[in-house]
Regions:
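Long, intrinsically disordered low-complexity tandem-repeat segments
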Residues: 540-570
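Short, low-complexity Pro/Thr/Gly
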Residues: 1-542, 574-579
Length: 580
């Protein structure tokens, strides 16, 4: 071995790392911090509208916007066999996760003259399974949050991880609370009876939810927390759709309708947007232009024809095992994309429109995948199910192997060991990391690209699904949201071929360095990174990055989101005027 094969580095014990001076942080905050409560200007059982005039264009708004509302609804059905009440909230029944937004077909937000729209119900249950689950669960004091881990709620009723469970199901870590532990203001009509009795139960509850709509933030990103300014008018419209995901229960045949006797038929009460306003200190000088990271999540749906057979339980006398029902390969439609997304999310589920309160947020397990992208065919054909799970975790999924694979082992006292179906696969792939790209392309590249894929799935559940399933693709397209003097614009697909090639000669960051510096949440994974230091500076968040121009014209700093990353080199010609 030659000494040129390695270099020597001195590593000093922390105890011995003494110094004759320390750095002392001088914390600079806002001159005024004003929590603002904004009432809806119009409200019905089909839509809610807000129109908010900001104090001034110089006022900084927190991008963590909360909606607070009372929900009034009625659950009707007949008491099930072996039950004495229609609903046993905290055991077999509970609210769904983020119940208000689960009602929204679309959320439309207009900032100044620019409008962004998201198909909320179509994408939110998938997006919840990405990023840090612990940070998502921090909202469980203001809204039920827990996501489903079981395919069917009946399997979860006696389990400690029952998503519909009560406070008694909370273990030593109180951060993880089941949805049945959330306080319901009023339950009326859930009187005792016998099996077959018809009941209508009126429920009233107040929730406070973070809006899951970019450029707003809803997790706790470490690199993407800056506010935005340059706003004159903020308008939001919530279009209300079906109630089939509002309430969840293992009791079959329930119907859920908006409004109840306590609200005179109205579904919403005291509906407000909670926004935090910040007034800068007189010494804070910032550009008129403000740039923040942005992402959009368009979805592409392919309806599936045919019957997906049920799984079969095999009893060998000592244990029960599941044999999955098999289904022929499912082919997606050929999808035209005008940019290369950061990530793609693929799943197969019962059609959202066909789901009922008895259906968990579950997806058929994916065992094989084949991708055709940009004239390259047969990508990932040899990947095993375990490979696909590891790729999903690397792309930000918080699913466990037991959840992704669709089956887990359970032991109940005095019963044989048995296998039960779990919530199934949300497959996530990062472009350029898991799906190969040519040297002139990267996530965010503009162009015309064709994507087509096929999946093989299994069904471990005891239910066959006939002509009521769908294959869903969600693409994560990132870019920037630019505000200046009362106007705003969104930009995605901001990289040209020359931008990608010129970046090849720049000093590089390792992926692990980026994750360490900017965090690991879904909103930290946007390509418009904020908070990265100049390569080789040895500082994180220092200098200009996150400093005097934090959240300003350079989106967090000279390198991060500014002149280099997202600007003149990596932002392309049409972005240069906005980021320099």
């Amino acid at each position: 071995m030659s000494s040129s094969d390695f270099s020597k580095v001195k590593v000093l014990d922390d105890v011995l790392s003494t110094t004759d001076s320390v750095k002392y942080a001088v914390v600079k905050g806002a001159q005024n911090i004003t929590p603002s409560v904004n009432n809806a200007i119009s409200k019905s059982n089909s839509s809610i509208t807000f129109n908010i005039q900001t104090p001034s264009e110089a006022t900084v708004l927190s991008r963590r916007v909360m909606i607070k509302t009372k929900l009034f609804f009625t659950v009707s059905g007949v008491i099930a066999q072996g039950k004495t009440r229609l609903l046993d909230v905290g055991t077999d029944s509970a609210l769904g996760p983020f119940p208000f937004q689960s009602l929204c077909n679309t959320i439309q937000m207009t900032v100044n003259n620019n409008t962004v729209t998201q198909n909320q119900r179509d994408v939110m249950f998938a997006l919840m399974r990405f990023g840090d689950a612990r940070e998502m669960y921090r909202y469980n004091t203001s809204a039920p949050v827990a996501y489903d881990q079981y395919w069917q709620y009946s399997d979860a009723e006696l389990a400690s991880n029952n998503p519909n469970g009560s406070w008694s199901n909370v273990a030593m870590d109180p951060a993880y609370q089941p949805r049945g532990a959330f306080r319901i203001d009023r339950i009326q009509g859930n009187s005792q009876g016998v099996a077959g009795d018809a009941k209508s139960v009126a429920i009233s509850v107040e929730v406070i939810e973070p809006l899951m709509l970019s450029p707003l933030i809803w997790c706790d990103p470490q690199s993407n927390n800056q506010g935005f300014y340059g706003i004159q008018v903020l308008n939001l419209v919530f279009n209300i759709g079906s109630t089939n995901r509002l309430f969840r229960s293992s009791v079959p045949g329930l119907t859920v309708s908006l409004g109840n006797t306590a609200s005179n038929g109205e579904a919403f009460g005291d509906t407000q947007l909670l926004i935090q306003y910040y007034t800068r200190q007189p010494s804070d000088l910032v550009p008129a232009r403000n740039v923040v990271p942005y992402a959009e999540y368009p979805r592409y749906i392919t309806n599936i024809s045919g019957t997906i057979p049920a799984g079969v339980t095999v009893n060998d006398g000592a244990e029960y095992s599941l044999t999955a029902g098999q289904f022929p390969t499912i082919e997606s439609n050929s999808i035209s994309l005008n940019q290369i997304p950061d990530k793609i999310i693929i799943f197969v589920r019962k059609r959202l429109a066909s789901q009922t309160s008895a259906d968990a947020d579950c997806f058929f397990p994916i065992k094989r995948l084949r991708v055709n992208f940009n004239n390259k065919a047969g990508l990932l054909t040899s990947a095993t199910r375990w490979d696909l799970w590891r790729m999903s975790v690397e792309s930000g999924s918080n699913q466990t192997w037991a959840e992704f694979s669709g089956c887990a082992t359970r032991r109940v006292a005095n019963q044989p060991l048995n296998e039960i179906p779990t919530c199934g696969s949300l497959l996530a792939l990062s472009m350029g990391k898991h799906i190969e790209l040519d040297d002139v392309f990267a996530p965010g590249s503009i162009g015309q690209f064709q994507l087509q894929f096929s999946v093989e799935i299994e069904n471990f559940s005891p239910t066959a699904y006939a002509d009521n399933t769908e294959l869903v693709l969600i693409t994560m397209n990132t870019g920037v949201f630019v505000l200046e003097r009362g106007t705003s614009q969104t930009y995605t697909a901001i990289l040209s071929r020359s931008d990608v090639l010129s970046a090849s000669s720049m000093p590089g960051y390792k992926s692990s360095d980026v994750k360490r510096l900017v965090g690991g949440n879904m909103e930290d994974s946007f390509k418009s990174l904020v908070g990265l230091p100049d390569k080789g500076s040895g500082q994180s968040g220092g200098g200009t990055s996150g400093g005097g121009t934090s959240g300003g014209g350079y989106s967090g700093g000279g390198t991060s989101g500014g002149g280099t990353s997202g600007g003149g080199l990596s932002g392309g010609g049409r972005m240069k005027k906005h980021l320099q």
